[in-house]
Amino acid sequence: MDLVNHLEDRLLFAVPKKGRLYESCVNVLKGSDIKFRRNPRLDIALVQNLPIALVFLPAADIPRFVGTGRVHLGITGQDQIAEARLRIGDKLKIEELVDLQFGGCKLQVQVPESGDITSVDQLVGRRIVTSFEYLVAEYFDKVEKKAKSEGKVDSGIKTEISFVSGSVEASCALGIADAVVDLVESGETMRASGLKPIETVMSTSAVLVRSSNCSSELEPLLQTIITRIRGYIIAQQYVLVNYNVNREHLPVVLKITPGKRAPTITTLDEPGWVAVSSMVVKKEVAQVMDKLSQNHAHDILVLSIDNSRP
C-alpha cells in the first residue's frame, strides 16, 4: 500500500517513536479509541476507525513538525517544546492543550559526586554537555550575567556548552565535561554515573499539542480527539466511590467526598438512609475510605473509571 497517497484528508498525529514516552502514548491512544496497527518497519500507521494517520517521530522533532504545520496534533515533552521555541522562534506555531500526567521528570544540572562543585556559579567558564543546547545556553547566560554582576567571575569568561544526542551522563567520566544537564526521572542513571544534581533548569511532563495552522475542515475531528484524550486522562486520575450512610451523618461524609463537581445522592428504601456516589482522586482513595469508615459510612465500594468526557 502506498501510504503517501492515503494521507490526503487525514489528520496527522505525531507520536514519539520510542523511548520513555512511547508506551504511555500508546495507552492514551487506545484509551481514546484510536485503533491502529503499527508495522515496526514503518513510521506511519493509518488509524482504522477514524480519518487519522499516526506519524512516529523522535520526541525532539515533534514540536517542529507540529509548530510548522507539517502535522496537526502531537504528543511530546514540555522540555522539547521549550527547546524548540528557543531554536525556531516565532515561526513555531504550537499550542499546548492537555497535560497528560505522565513522563514527569526534571532537567537538572549534574556534577560529579566526588568533586567540589556545589553551585552553578562555580560552573561559569566550565564545560557543560547536554542534549538541550538552547535551553542550557539560555540558562547559563543568566547564571553568567548574575555572577559577573556580583563580581564572582571576570567579565570575559564564557561557559562552553556542547551538544550530544545521547549518553549525556557519561560525559564527565570521559573527561569531556565538568557538568552535564540532562533529564532525571528516578535518578538511578544519574547515581550510577557518579553524578549528583545541584540545580533544576525546569520540570517537564508529556503534553498534547496542536498546530495553530490547521485547516477549518479538520477542526471538528481535532476537537473530538482532544476531548477524548482529555476525558481519558481525567478518568485515569479518579475512581468512583460508592457508599451508604444514614442521613444524620451526611453533612460530615460529604465533606470527605465532595466529588469533582458534586456527589450523587440517592434515597434508599430503608428509612433515613441514602446511597452516595462520588469521584475521588485515585491516589487519595485509601485515606478517603478510612475516613468514611470512621464516620459511619457503610458498604464502601471503589469502582475504576475506564473513560470519561469533561
From Swiss-Prot:
GO terms of biological process kind: L-histidine biosynthetic process
Organism: Schizosaccharomyces pombe (strain 972 / ATCC 24843) (Fission yeast)
The reaction(s) this protein catalyses: 1-(5-phospho-beta-D-ribosyl)-ATP + diphosphate = 5-phospho-alpha-D-ribose 1-diphosphate + ATP
Family: Belongs to the ATP phosphoribosyltransferase family.
InterPro entries per the UniProt record, alphabetical: ATP-PRT_HisG_long, ATP_PRibTrfase_cat, ATP_PRibTrfase_CS, ATP_PRibTrfase_HisG, HisG_C, N-reg_PII-like_a/b, N-reg_PII/ATP_PRibTrfase_C
Gene3D superfamilies documented for this protein: 3.30.70.120, Periplasmic binding protein-like II
Associated pathway: Amino-acid biosynthesis; L-histidine biosynthesis; L-histidine from 5-phospho-alpha-D-ribose 1-diphosphate: step 1/9
Gene symbol of the encoding locus: his1
GO molecular-function term, one example from the UniProt record: ATP binding
Protein name: ATP phosphoribosyltransferase
Keyword flag Transferase: yes
GO cellular component: cytosol
Subcellular location, record wording: Cytoplasm
Top-tier EC class: transferase
Keywords, alphabetical: Amino-acid biosynthesis, ATP-binding, Cytoplasm, Glycosyltransferase, Histidine biosynthesis, Nucleotide-binding, Transferase
Functional note: Catalyzes the condensation of ATP and 5-phosphoribose 1-diphosphate to form N'-(5'-phosphoribosyl)-ATP (PR-ATP). Has a crucial role in the pathway because the rate of histidine biosynthesis seems to be controlled primarily by regulation of HisG enzymatic activity.
EC number per UniProt: 2.4.2.17
Domain of life: Eukaryota
